[in-house]
Amino acid sequence: MFRKFESLIDVFRAHDETQPPASLFGYYWRYCRQAWPFLAALMVSGLFTSLIEVSILRFVGEIVDLLRQTTPERLLEDDGRLFLFMGLVILVLRPLAQLAHDLLVQQTIAPGMTNLIRWQTHRYVLRQSLTYFANDFAGRIASNIVQSAASLRDSTVQVIDALWFVTIFSASALAILAEADWRLTLPLAGWIVVYVATLAIFVPRIRRRSEILAHRRAVLTGRIVDSYTNIQAVKLFADLEREDEHAREALKAHTDDFQRQTRLITLMNLCVSSSNGALVVATGAVAIWLWTQNLTSLGQIAVAAGLAIRITTMSGWVMWTSIGIFDNVGQVQEGMRTIARPQTLVDAADAAELRVDEGEIRFEKVRFHYGKEGGVIDDLSFVIAPGEKVGLVGRSGAGKSTLVNLLLRFYDVESGRVLIDGQDVARVTQDSLRRQVGMVTQDTSLLHRSIADNILYGRPDAPREAMIAAAERAHAHAFIIGLADGEGRRGYETLVGERGVKLSGGQRQRVAIARVLLKNAPILVLDEATSALDSEVEAAIQESLYSLMEGKTVIAIAHRLSTIAAMDRLIVLEDGDIVETGTHQELLARGGIYAALWRRQSGGFLDARAA
């Protein structure tokens, strides 16, 4: 039975992959409609539960009248069927209604709907541009995806569980009281007006506070995660006081807004408690007066009193649930600000798969400024022939890494074109483009998975023998087989820690090189690929890289010029423009910027291949 209900929602179902709606109602509807049969069933369950609750109180009133009017000898004989029916309602129907409710909420909606939302929002956010992630905390993004899904589910279930249940219960109570005497409905009707007015006054204010509080919580989470993620820098600069202050500032703002919210809650609770007391007193007074006028029975008085007390008890539950609803709505709105943003870098509607037959790279009149008014790259054109090995040289900020980012379409050019084998990278799918490029960067980030998972990331279907061979060529196999983690995993199954923190910089770089060697893409980009290696290991790995370069188009970036001196051609960039181009020897003979950079590097040496 449990498995049946747990499998009703397919978390990984095909879904709308467009931008989530920016409106609150639209955002809720996008995900609630995918679970609407179960939410509708929950409403039916709530309807039956509320009617059963009211019928039990009405039955109590009938018992009081029966006990007053019937002798003990004839009670069961005349009314036994009524007692049997109510026994079935209380012992069978009521538990079944509760079971149906719990199965729907706990087995179907809670896990299924929540993880469906998380899966779909995660997939959408994962396809955002690098700029999106550069402008926010990773911890804040993750927190909003995880928390907003749970909050959307909770607020939806709370509306059905509390507001729908109480609406049916109150309407049924008014009908029962009106059946006895219309004047018995007056206290309850007046209480409903006061209660709704109280909620109307306080709940919107609490909602605004909840939205602010959700933002404060996300900022606090982001700052704490940022400190933990960069713990090495925090320890290195020995300035824990600054980190304390950074977190204290966010925590203080969160505390202040939390206190402002709780003040409103306390005032609302006072108003509701006062109106509850007035309801019980007024209902009792009207019922007793009607009884003194022989206009109602003792059973009807018992029903009226029972309903009044039950409603006042439920009012506190509804009040706290309403607060929870808007607290959750605030969290959903905070999540929407992160999730429901348009994807700024998407495949064209008619995008084709990139095919690389030769590997020619062409930049045609490219202009790009990272959204600024000027600088970086203006009207840049050059061609890298198929199989040519080109080194990009220049001071920091000259535009070297920007060219690589444009080639990989991490950003779109503002004008001009970037082509691979005559195909505009803006007109092919991003996945097919990046599958054709192998890249090693100086900032080597590894996934918090096993060594094997990281090496296989570029070619998941590769056999284990090929993976180990790639590690050996990257001079990584020797240290990998000696690794172990705290869970007893060893060698290639060892977890590397967040961003590969358990490995040294050189070890991370060798794993990254092994990953590219295994991927074996036709275009190779090396951005300071050996910057974290010592000279001996670097020289050995260079041999593997040179063999990998055979038959491939290569772009290499390095500040240590000796590592790229053997390239077929060097392009020297200055402020986004090409100022020199030629071989290593030609540029030295020219005596320009490259020659000056070469002379400035202390301990520089000519690679044997460049001599």
What is each model feature region?
Residues 1-53, 68-87, 101-109, 123, ...:
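Membrane-integrated ABC transporters
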Residues 26, 37-62, 83, 87, ...:
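Alpha-helical segments in transporter systems
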Residues 33-34, 130-131, 147-156, 160, ...:
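An intracellular "coupling" helix at the cytosolic face of ABC transporter transmembrane type-1 domains
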Residues 34, 38-51, 158-213, 282-300, ...:
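Transmembrane helices of ABC transporter permease
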Residues 239, 263, 311-340:
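Cytosolic ends of transmembrane helices, especially the final helix of ABC transmembrane type-1 domains
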Residues 10-21, 52-61, 65, 90-138, ...:
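Juxtamembrane helix-loop junctions of ABC transporter transmembrane domains
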Residues 354-611:
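ABC-type nucleotide-binding domain
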